[in-house]
UniProtKB/Swiss-Prot annotation:
HAMAP family: RibA (MF_00179). It comes from the Bacteria. It catalyses: GTP + 4 H2O = 2,5-diamino-6-hydroxy-4-(5-phosphoribosylamino)-pyrimidine + formate + 2 phosphate + 3 H(+). GTP binds at residues 49-53, 70, 92-94, 114, 149, 154. This is GTP cyclohydrolase-2. One of its GO terms (molecular function) is zinc ion binding. Keywords: GTP-binding, Hydrolase, Metal-binding, Nucleotide-binding, Riboflavin biosynthesis, Zinc. Its cofactor is Zn(2+).
Amino acid sequence: MQLKRVAEAKLPTPWGDFLMVGFEELATGHDHVALVYGDISGQTPVLARVHSECLTGDALFSLRCDCGFQLEAALTHIAEEGRGILLYHRQEGRNIGLLNKIRAYALQDQGYDTVEANHQLGFAADERDFTLCADMFKLLGVDEVRLLTNNPKKVEILTEAGINIVERVPLIVGRNPNNEHYLDTKAAKMGHLLGK
């Protein structure tokens, strides 16, 4: 186990009241959070989203990506379902960090795509570690999920880490003229399933 569960509190939102559960990485002290809606116990697979931190999309309403749109849609789906989990995975910019993400944006402004920009900065296309999310699910007592994602690699990694993904639920929202090239690159170079 790479994490420990350290704190929890009620979080009222426009979608209803969630239980916010805080986790800490044992090796680094980095924190992550889960938003739990309703009763997630029992044998029925839980609707869940692993949402990687995106300050620009989630908090600053950037149209360069689909992250903020996906966050809102995931919370809506979970609330409509009556139960579910959103793991907020604190690995900004596919885990290159905020400042490097800004540098990658500058390279994209010069014509590089999102993958090429990461490579120019010395990073892989995706530096995230989703095994942390498997540990969060386990610490919440969940081992079967219906995963809201367009990323088959996320399904593969979570499955290898012991989480039974019984269904991949598409989450295709937020396409706009500012992020079309970004989304097309994620589909073509990273295998994301983003049918237009």
